[in-house]
Amino acid sequence: IQRGSGDSDKVRQQITGFLKQKFPILFFPEATTTDGQQVRRLHGRLLQSAVDTQTPVQPVLICYVTPQGRLDMVMPFIGEMSFAEHLKQVLAHPAVTAHVMVLPAISSVGHDMHSLTNLLQQQMRDGLAALHAKVLVD
């Protein structure tokens, strides 16, 4: 979705249709990927589909860690490089470990878009801090 394009309403309607058919949907609510140091501000417009269909939201966090116990800065697809450039870097990169944390699902029942976004934001921030404490070397 390009910012300012008006596509988010179209995409939200498509997501709502898929959720009504019980298809799972995966997206980055930060509207981007990050280097894994922090959770950026979430954009909640697409979460409206979960509210409209009373579908729970399943937060999942990933961080890439070097053998030295530090966050890896090559694996995350960030910045301005093309996917092909990124893939080339990843394939040439030494081994790293991807740590995945699946947080408890969040019920969308009783939430509006803003309250669901705020709750998801807080749970993801808390979860990332816990994941870092578990897998990173001080």
Predicted regions and their residues:
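Membrane-interfacial amphipathic helices and adjacent loop/beta segments
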Residues: I1-K20
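A cross-family acyltransferase "interaction/gating" segment
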Residues: G4, F23, D35-L119, L131-K134
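Surface-exposed alpha-helical segments enriched in charged/polar residues
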Residues: T16-G17, Q48-V51, R125
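Generic beta-sheet signal
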Residues: F23-P29
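C-terminal alpha-helix
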Residues: Q123-L131
